[in-house]
Every structure is written in structure tokens, then in C-alpha cells.
Amino acid sequence: MSAAPDWNPATLTQRVFEILRDEILDVSEGFTPQSNLVDAGLDSLAVTQLMLSIEESTGIWVDESLLTPENLETTATLALCVHSQLD
């Protein structure tokens, strides 16, 4: 078995971005970690799918109370929220 990845804000941002881009959203080439997620099509169903994918991919569970508009604004803000659950 390999060791768990060292999840830091940068690696989490990249992983969350990949999940959003490849599994959750139908996005254009211009989609970046700083793109607004609601503008990119994130809705409540997509949030549920996203959080399940993040937990499955990283092993990090995020409390629903942290899924605020501020934390779901961009990939980067969401990754920081996920990272906060490691403390």
C-alpha cells in the first residue's frame, strides 16, 4: 500500500479542480481554480456529488455547515475549506 498523499492547500486545490473539471461541471477551456463555481454551473446537486467525490478521492470529510457561498465561491476557496478539516 502506498502512503496517503500529503494534502496541502496546493495539492487539494489541484485535486478539487480535477474533480470539478473532469467529473462534475461541463466547463470551457477558460475554467481555472479562481473561476466562480456558481457561474460555471455548480448547483446543489453538483455540490453533493462534489463532496462525495472529494471524500472518496482524499479521505477528507467536510462538515455540511462549512458549505457556505463563501467557501464554494472558487476551487481555491473550497480547497482551503477542505484543508481546514485536517486540523
Model-derived segments and spans:
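Catalytic nucleophile serine of serine hydrolases
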Residues: 44
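C-terminal structural segments of small proteins and small subunits
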Residues: 67, 72-85
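STAS-like cytosolic regulatory interaction modules
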Residues: 1-2, 67
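Phosphopantetheinylated carrier protein domains
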Residues: 48-71
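Phosphopantetheine carrier-protein modules
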Residues: 22-40, 59-66
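Thiotemplate assembly-line natural product biosynthesis machinery
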Residues: 2-29, 80-87
